[in-house]
Amino acid sequence: LIEKYWGEFEIKDQPTFEVRKESPITEVVETEVWGPEAERLYMGFRFNGANTEDSRILTMTDMVLSNSSAGLIDLNLNQSQELIGGGCFPMIMKDYSLHGFYGSPKPGQTLEEVKDLLLSQIEEVKKGNFPDWLVGAIISDLKLSQIKKMESNSGRANEFVDAFILDIPWNEHQNEMAELEKITKQDIIDFANENYSDNNYVIVYKRTGEDTSIPKVEKPIITPVSVNREDQSDFLVSLSEEKVKDIEPVFLNF
């Protein structure tokens, strides 16, 4: 089918993808968003893109911080109820990667306090204050997730999609887990100390209140439209006068 419908298409030169060089983040970039919903914050650090050492160690660092059960944020902040629903996630893209953090305040708590709590857990990683067994457990959990993913057609298809859109050679994509297994606790500690500081992130505060920056547009005068509900076209009249035979069932003869 591919040859039949697309076989005559000529192969053209593929455009070369070039990463747009972004300036380093040297001071905190803060943004505020206002609305009636509950307050929360999102914070992000920028890293190198897919198929780099950054992206692999970022995956491990993220799991040390938050893995839904035994991460530092899970234990020290969520289970101890220091805040509401804190966590983090990696977003691996072709040009750059993002390590995002989020959290909501308890009653009487400020978003700035939530930010400080999340940053404090990064400091714990820098100091190596997480158990030695956690790195091996993370690898086991990632392997289990990979096995479950490969049990479905959609999961296997997504593996091809990820490798394609991130421009990772298939053999290297399949070897990703082996590369993750080489990462040690010290690698994670060094990575955290080199890449996370108190001034190289972007943060968005979602605050409760009225957004006064919303532009107002004057309502235009709308010209009434006559819908002519009673009028019928000649075509409608002729169509309505046509006689249609009743549908009779046709039974299969076995």
Please provide the spans of the model-predicted regions.
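M16 family metallopeptidases and their MPP-like homologs
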Residues: 1, 38-49, 74-182, 202-207, ...
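Proteolytic maturation boundary segments
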Residues: 1-34, 39-40, 75, 171-254
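A broad, low-specificity signal for short, low-complexity segments enriched in glycine/proline
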Residues: 2-8, 21-25, 47-48, 60-65, ...
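Short amphipathic alpha-helical signal-transduction/dimerization elements
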Residues: 6, 65-69, 119-126
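Active/ligand-binding-proximal structured segments within catalytic/core domains
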Residues: 43, 53-65, 73
